[in-house]
Design a protein with these regions (language model features):
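Hydrophobic beta-strand anchors of alpha/beta hydrolase catalytic cores
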Residues: 59-60, 90, 136
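Structural microenvironment flanking redox-active thiols in thiol-disulfide oxidoreductases
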Residues: 71-109, 119-125
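A short beta-strand-turn-helix
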Residues: 36-58
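Bacterial N-terminal signal peptides that target proteins for export
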Residues: 2-15
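C-terminal motif of bacterial Sec signal peptides marking the signal peptidase cleavage site
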Residues: 23-26
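Short pre-active-site segment immediately N-terminal to redox-active cysteine/selenocysteine motifs
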Residues: 56-58, 63-66
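Bacterial signal peptide processing site
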Residues: 28-30
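Thiol/disulfide oxidoreductase modules built on the thioredoxin-like
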Residues: 107-112, 119-167
């Protein structure tokens, strides 16, 4: 009896993970804007997304609508995500923000990459974020966290340098 319950629990968790991954399958950078769209699911959905992207390096940008430096650097991420769309994946994480503020922000700054809602900074803490805004994390193609940059990028060239160093050649 206990074995059946354990197996059923494992199958339930597997089914949830598969459903999350299937729901995220259309959220990549190849193509459309994700204006005004925030993905839920918390840390599990974020980790499922990273697992789905294995084989390509990933840049994760943690931001909030109330963060001035986030607003200043966000256009860099918009442009560089388009520039690197064949070799690097980008993911946004909106942490400790109101849903209305985040949606308004995304209306002004549409992105070609998915954005996760992270009201308690649970996702951000998984990549050493959640303490400073903005924070950018770089994952290698095999899914390992390579580097976390806390604070804003002063120039697009600075962000490009870190993309090359920690994502492309990481």
């Amino acid at each position: 009896m206990a074995r059946r319950q354990a197996t059923a629990g494992g199958l339930t968790r597997l089914a949830i993970a598969v459903a999350i991954a299937a729901g995220l399958a259309g959220c990549g950078t190849a193509g459309g804007e994700t204006t005004g769209r925030l993905l839920g699911g918390g840390r599990d959905a974020f980790q499922a997304r990273l697992a789905q992207l294995r084989g390509r390096p990933v840049v994760v940008n943690q931001w909030a609508s109330w963060c001035g430096p986030c607003r200043a650097e966000f256009p860099y991420f918009q442009r560089l995500a388009r520039k690197h769309d064949k070799q690097v994946e980008f993911v946004g994480v909106n942490s400790r923000d109101s849903r209305d503020g985040a949606l308004e922000f995304l209306g002004k700054f549409p992105t070609p990459f998915p954005q996760f809602e992270d009201p308690n900074a649970e996702i951000a803490r998984s990549f050493r974020g959640g303490r400073a805004w903005p924070t950018t994390a770089f994952y290698t193609a095999d899914g390992q966290l390579n580097y976390t940059h806390q604070g804003s990028y002063g120039t697009e060239a600075d962000l490009e340098r870190d993309i090359q160093r920690y994502a492309v050649h990481g």
